[in-house]
Amino acid sequence: MWIGVISLFPEMFRAITEHGVTGRAVKSGLLQIECWNPREFTHDKHRTVDDRPYGGGPGMLMMVQPLRDAIHAAKQAAGDGAKVIYLSPQGRKLTQAGVTELATNQKLILVAGRYEGIDERVIQTEVDEEWSIGDYVLSGGELPAMTLIDAVSRLVPGVLGDQASAEQDSFTDGLLDHPHYTRPELLDGLAVPEALTSGNHEVIRRWRLKQSLGRTWQRRPELINNLALTDEQESLLAEYVREVRDSVK
């Protein structure tokens, strides 16, 4: 997978190109990340990349010419088929379903804004989609871009050593992940659930599914409401709910 990034702070992306799962993917050639800095496309001695907004008001916008030139350079490097994404609070909220959708693209160009944002006409003429990672304000689009890269790259075949890791992650099936345990078997008086030490794969599978359903019901009930549960899932969830209610009587 090829990902181009437009950013005034390309050095920030070393965090994902040199470390962790994404760093290994880059080193193995499964993931290629290239950055373009609009500052490199300026024509004045001060290398200006911000400009005043029409209508006044606080803050500045990214200057149109350097930004557009950087996007054009990334598009030329990408060739045909690259989808341009602007990381924006006004965009579609990123979910695991959205990550799966984005992962079907072989080429992405991510535009990380700064200041108060970018000219609306640049969005209209250069951007294919806007995406947001949540309803809060950040100083720029770099962290959202890195979040998107990390999430999408996990779905690229071969990036994870065990593809089951991606398939069993939280949200992959619309549910939160089940609890995890490792050694020691007893920690400060708290034991690993018997189901996980039983050695019975079916018992373990059902326990994990029940915990996943129950945790989603308790912490993100809106996710449960949006799912069409199977008979087994409904039965396990009902069992979990009874256990919780019995424990507080």
From Swiss-Prot:
Signal peptide residue numbers: none
Entry GO MF terms: tRNA (guanine(37)-N1)-methyltransferase activity
The enzyme's E.C. designation: 2.1.1.228
SUPFAM superfamilies (UniProt xref): alpha/beta knot (SSF75217)
Annotated compartments: Cytoplasm
GO cellular-component term (any): cytosol
Annotated keywords: Cytoplasm, Methyltransferase, S-adenosyl-L-methionine, Transferase, tRNA processing
InterPro entries: Alpha/beta_knot_MTases, tRNA_m1G_MeTrfase_C_sf, tRNA_m1G_MeTrfase_TrmD, tRNA_m1G_MTases_N, tRNA_MeTrfase_TRMD/TRM10
Function description: Specifically methylates guanosine-37 in various tRNAs.
Assembly behavior: Homodimer.
Protein family per UniProt: Belongs to the RNA methyltransferase TrmD family.
Name used for this protein in its record: tRNA (guanine-N(1)-)-methyltransferase
Organism encoding this protein: Aeromonas salmonicida (strain A449)
Gene name tied to this protein: trmD
